[in-house]
Amino acid sequence: MIKKIIITVCTLIFFVTNVSFADITFWTTEVQPARMAKQEAMAKDFEAKTGIKVEVIPVEEKDLGTRATAAAAAGDLPDVIYHTLQYVLPWAEAGILDVDANNAVVKELGKKTFAPGALNMAKSGSKIAAVPVLSLIHI
């Protein structure tokens, strides 16, 4: 399920933003070797289907906030960031997240694609600031 959502999100971001580029840069905090291998395989599948190369860049979760802030200041943010909920509001306010593009992706996929709670937690004002890709319930 996550594979399908990530591939769909990458595709939609490409088309929604009307950016003409050959590559997508994807930062991930899933840095364990088995998970990196799976993400690399998904990137190759995406490239085979679209002709667009995805560069999967591992970023340790503890370094993500600092690295994203520095990349934003340098004007060198990746196209897609796999991140936790804690970053949604501050990054939306700082302009690190493209709220309009993310909102358009959710609209294109349809809100019924997502758990209502996940969408509510990803809101910034009246818009969805980040595309939920995982929703866990802890009991």
Predicted segments — roles?
Residues 58-67, 86:
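Short helix-initiation/N-cap motifs at beta->coil->alpha
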Residues 65-76, 93-94:
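Short helices/loops that flank or line small-molecule/ion binding pockets
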Residues 25-27, 55-58, 79-82, 130-132:
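Structural recognition of the beta-strand scaffold that forms the well-ordered cores
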Residues 24-39:
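Extracytoplasmic "Venus flytrap"
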Residues 3-9:
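Sec-dependent signal peptide recognition
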Residues 17-22:
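Sec/Tat signal peptide C-region and signal peptidase I cleavage site
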Residues 85-136:
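Hinge/lid segment of periplasmic solute-binding proteins
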Residues 40-56:
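Short alpha-helix C-terminal cap/hinge motif
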